[in-house]
């Protein structure tokens, strides 16, 4: 087998995670968020595995067009909306919904001639202060959208949480109250809950939930693990040992000689590095799974390789598999060692890593 790293994507895990989220929010439809190349899992791979999802959320128009070209017929929603008036005929032609979060988008809708109206999800800034119309702007914007012939009726309504991944932070309740007060009595769907909302804030689930990271088997909450919610890691990042060598006490290893062995040991060199998207700043002690056990990274991660301490009596050999993250070694745990979040790890793999659907 070729020794280079690959991301093995489990279709059964994706389907298990969708089912688990439906169980968490039985009254809600599921807008499966597949932006950023399906969180690094492969856009079409994920969409084809999740054909039973009620819709798909994307960040960019080209992602939506790729899904349509790939035969996906489900509802598609551009979570950041459109950015040019010339995008609007594409939304119409390919039956793509759009978020409207800024006055520039509203003006383009009012000024463009379209063959039929576009389905709009009006985004309310309930407290994240990134995208969306403020409560003070909402009524005027809503009325303008209602008056616009290019906007399908009813208008759907949405917001996004700033702190839902902090289960003890009451700011999510503040945001829910603001959104619900502002939109009370209006027709159309409502969507508030991201992965953390769906898992930790059931009162936010509404008509649609928008899970992203949880679909891939990962918890959105630091210190938590997807398995605690019946989720299964959909990605296994695997490579191989390309060298096993005896290493003497007091000898350094790797660039800068930052790690020195305290005793005689055996080192393994794994064929993956920052050129593949594995973080260069992974510190000494970050775990890798080799032959049924965790072994620590030692020395600096280089472009194509990293080194692990297999232990003095190790029997590992060249060609043995090395798991960087997956079911046996949760990506949440690896992210915590590195000082980042699992989202960043799974989405930053480079094109050198083959993504294979299993």
From Swiss-Prot:
* This protein's record includes keyword Isomerase: yes
Q: In which pathway does it act?
A: Amino-acid biosynthesis; D-alanine biosynthesis; D-alanine from L-alanine: step 1/1
PROSITE patterns the UniProt entry points to:
ALANINE_RACEMASE
| UniProt KW Isomerase keyword | yes
Q: Name one GO molecular function term.
A: alanine racemase activity
Q: Which residues form the active site?
A: 35 (proton acceptor), 255 (proton acceptor)
SMART domains hit by this protein: Ala_racemase_C
Q: Which residues carry this modification: N6-(pyridoxal phosphate)lysine?
A: 35
Q: Which reaction does it catalyse?
A: L-alanine = D-alanine
Q: Which cofactors, by name?
A: pyridoxal 5'-phosphate
Alphabetical UniProt keywords:
Isomerase, Pyridoxal phosphate
Which is a Gene Ontology cellular component entry for this protein? Answer: cytosol
Enzyme Commission number(s) from the entry: 5.1.1.1
Task: Give the matching Pfam families.
Answer: Ala_racemase_C, Ala_racemase_N
Q: Which InterPro entries match?
A: Ala_racemase (IPR000821), Ala_racemase/Decarboxylase_C (IPR009006), Ala_racemase_C (IPR011079), Ala_racemase_N (IPR001608), Ala_racemase_pyridoxalP-BS (IPR020622), PLP-binding_barrel (IPR029066)
Q: Which residues bind substrate?
A: 130, 303
GO BP terms in the entry = D-alanine biosynthetic process
The entry's function note states: Catalyzes the interconversion of L-alanine and D-alanine. May also act on other amino acids.
Q: Name the family.
A: Belongs to the alanine racemase family.
Q: What is the protein named?
A: Alanine racemase
Organism expressing this protein natively: Shewanella baltica (strain OS155 / ATCC BAA-1091)
């Amino acid at each position: 087998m070729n020794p280079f790293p690959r991301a093995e994507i489990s279709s059964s895990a994706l389907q298990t995670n969708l089912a688990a989220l439906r169980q968490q929010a039985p009254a809600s439809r599921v807008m499966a968020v597949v932006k950023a190349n399906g969180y690094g899992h492969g856009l079409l791979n994920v969409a084809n595995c999740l054909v039973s999802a009620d819709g798909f959320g994307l960040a960019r128009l080209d992602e939506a067009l790729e899904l349509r070209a790939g035969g996906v017929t489900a509802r598609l929603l551009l979570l950041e909306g459109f950015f040019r008036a010339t995008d609007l005929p594409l939304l119409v032609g390919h039956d793509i919904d759009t978020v409207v979060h800024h006055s520039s988008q509203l003006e383009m809708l009012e000024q463009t001639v379209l063959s039929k109206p576009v389905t709009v999800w009006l985004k309310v800034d309930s407290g994240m202060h990134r995208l969306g119309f403020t409560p003070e702007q909402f009524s005027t914007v809503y009325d303008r959208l209602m008056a616009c012939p290019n906007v399908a009726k009813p208008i759907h309504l949405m917001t996004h949480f700033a702190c839902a991944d902090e289960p003890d932070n009451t700011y999510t309740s503040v945001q829910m109250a603001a959104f619900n007060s502002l939109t009370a009595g209006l027709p159309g769907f409502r969507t508030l809950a991201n992965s953390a909302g769906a898992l930790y804030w059931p009162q936010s689930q509404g008509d649609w939930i928008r899970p992203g990271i949880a679909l891939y088997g990962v918890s959105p909450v630091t210190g938590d693990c997807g398995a605690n919610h019946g989720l299964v890691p959909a990605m296994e990042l695997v490579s191989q040992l390309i060298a096993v060598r005896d290493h003497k006490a007091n000898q350094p290893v790797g660039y800068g000689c930052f790690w020195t062995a305290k005793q005689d040991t055996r080192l393994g060199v794994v064929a993956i590095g920052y050129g593949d998207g594995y973080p260069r700043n992974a510190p000494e002690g970050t775990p890798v799974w080799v032959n049924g056990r965790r072994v620590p990274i030692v020395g600096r991660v280089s472009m194509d390789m990293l080194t692990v301490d297999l232990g003095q009596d190790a029997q590992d050999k060249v060609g043995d598999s090395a798991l960087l993250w997956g079911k046996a070694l949760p990506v949440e745990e690896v992210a915590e060692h590195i000082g980042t979040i699992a989202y960043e790890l799974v989405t930053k793999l480079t094109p050198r890593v083959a993504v294979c659907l299993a």
